[in-house]
Amino acid sequence: MNKKDLEILVCPVTQSRLVLKVGEELNGEIISGLLVSEEGREYPINNGIPDLTYPSQLPEKDENVRAFYDSRGDAYDANLHLTFDTHGEDENEVRNKFVDSLELNPSSRVLEVASGTGRDSEVIASRLGDDGQLCLTDISPEMLIRGQKRLAGVAVPTTYCLSNASYLPFPDQYFDAVYSFGALGEFSDITRCLAEMVRVSKIGAKIVVGDESIPPWLRETEFAKILITTNKQFLAKVPLDEMPVEARNVCLRWVIGGVFYLIDFNVGEGEPKGNFDIEIPGVRGGTLRTRYFGLLESVTPETKRLIERAREKKDVSMYQWLEEVNRQAALRDLGEEEKP
């Protein structure tokens, strides 16, 4: 860890700034110590990597995932080529296409969540210059250390930390792009993880995520059943229900043999906005807004027929007739006059 990392890292719970308490320092690098939040929460630094994992007692699924990846660093890198070989894909070409979706420039600030051993990280790093910024985080110390070794010597300033994807230790609206491929389905709370990615992204930033999921039209094929026999994660659904309301320009496609999904989107601000006050022509009339907010209690069928005849005789829309009649009746009963 470098002291400059304090400009980026924050408490994953409150986003307050952190104070460094140095244990061991070597050539300007912090080897051990503590990061302390304004609220007094302490996060250790071990072997040069800050551990900002929250909560300290992870949900069972996340704990199991961490233990799994901590135990298979060697096998992961040695065998990952099988995923691409099975589907006749070139790993380097595929990863570069994924990173293309981030629309980076050399000065971009980029976060990779669940960066693993750095196979995508080095592609991202190759797109960034010394005025850019790359932050890599993972829940597994073993995987993150391997990624750190892979990226030794890259030009872009790089920050490494351990964290839970549900509580990212970065400030609001900081990054130009966020990337996570191959881990989303293993997060215990996908909705919260995606919301956190949005929180740390600037308005307009690009987010790219993906993982295993055989599409519905292939689920009953022999092709799918062969894959699922070895890896049940292919049964996972695409997390469309978990997508944040801030997602704009959403693109979903299937990649790597058509059995992994890739979602990319821009970050918007809050819910989408629309002009709901445009007068709608026709018998019903009104606007989208009045049709939603202006609903009244039901009337009897006989009264409804009278209203329809009266509206037709006056030759106005139903909205105009109801607005006028109800307004006049309300003012009369209240003993008030129409304001000019």
Please give the residue ranges for each predicted region.
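N-terminal, positively charged/glycine-rich alpha-helical extensions of SAM-dependent methyltransferases
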Residues: 8, 24-78, 325, 332, ...
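Conserved class I S-adenosyl-L-methionine
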Residues: 54-105, 119-123, 143-146, 206-231
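Class I SAM-dependent methyltransferase SAM/SAH-binding core
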Residues: 109-167
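A short glycine-rich, Lys/Arg-flanked "PGG" loop and its adjoining helix->strand segment in the class I
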Residues: 191-206
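Short alpha-helix
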Residues: 230-248, 261
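Short, basic amphipathic alpha-helical segments that act as recognition/interaction helices
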Residues: 306, 314-340
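A short acidic, Gly/Pro-enriched loop at the edge of an enzyme's catalytic core
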Residues: 166-177
